[in-house]
Amino acid sequence: MAEECSCEWPQAEAKEQAVLISAGAVFLASGAAAVLRNRPRWFWVWLAGLLAWATIPKYFICARCENYDRPCGFMYGGKYAARFFKRSDRPFNAAGYFAEGGSLAVFQFLPAIAARRDPKALVVYALTAAVFQSLLVKIACIDCVRFARDPWKARYCPTFKIVERLGLATPERTG
């Protein structure tokens, strides 16, 4: 059962979400460009990884999250998931973890592998990835660490653990 929290999870701010979504679009464009420029036959695999990430983990993770059907800081993920999936009362399990990790591995690492001999494309991709990931932590993950009551987030999410260990946020749960 989720622990009680004396705090209210903040709604996603439109300006922050616009910045995050824009940075994500630039990151995706640089990834697509790196693949198309260096390994064009890999593009469909990369696109399949992206589409898999945009759907499958949203069922296994977002449809089970306390922010389901709410405009959370992860690119309005709770609202996005509610458009495609019914809320699931099933507990988080390894399927969500593997769906997220597997699809992320395909669409985030294929551009770097494709551009390994193209320094310009590799630097552009690495910079856009760093900016997007930094914004994601700042805009979404810090609030998730502070306000999440779903115990599986602290137990399984690697970014949750990194944010906590770096001291960027601490959970405000009460026991």
Task: Tell what function each PLM region has.
Residues R37-E66, A130-K138:
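Hydrophobic alpha-helical membrane-embedded segments
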Residues A114-A148, W152-K153:
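Eukaryotic polytopic
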